[in-house]
Amino acid sequence: RGWIVALVAVVLVFALLALGMWSCTSAVSSSIGTLGALGSTATTSDVDYLTSDAVGVIDIDGTIQYDGTTCSPEGLKAQLDRAEQNPHIKAVVLRVNSGGGTATAGEEMAEYLREFSKPVVVSSASINASAAYMISSQADYIFTAKTTSIGAIGTVMQVTDLSGLMEKLGISVDNIASADSKDSSYGTRPLTEEERAYYQAMVDQINESFIETAA
């Protein structure tokens, strides 16, 4: 029953937000990566001493990548593990303000959220897109503002060709590789048709995984 009450409380908070009846200094505010109680704020150290039911707050603010913050798989998992292990944390609010990032990192984070046993509500800020949306799709509820940029399900890869610029600058590069396509992403020559097809197949495969995760 405890988690049901906590989830209802979270949903009510976001209903008030949607109606413009909750201030910017609402009870769910906290610093990046902290877990706080609904009706108060708490530091990460305070969480260990909670004595009543609470709602955890975790921020994903920035590029999804492997940097150790809550925008990374290892950082998010650490916070989710703390929330999972604390019996007083009945649900989690994931505050997302991210345009995406590394597909692999996003997929890992989505998996961690999918395995999390307690209710999760996503609060979207100005943007919740691409890899960030992949993560958010695993929550029980996603809330957005009318002006939130959300979704952007798709995959892109860039392979830069600097050979023309290097020629103008008089720069010559000799690539010594063990296979013909080993230097295809170095930017020192245009892609061959076979290499372009290889990278396109890779992008398509990643995108299929993205769609399956978000579905």
Language-model features: where?
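Small-residue-centered hinge/linker elements
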Residues: 1-119, 127-215
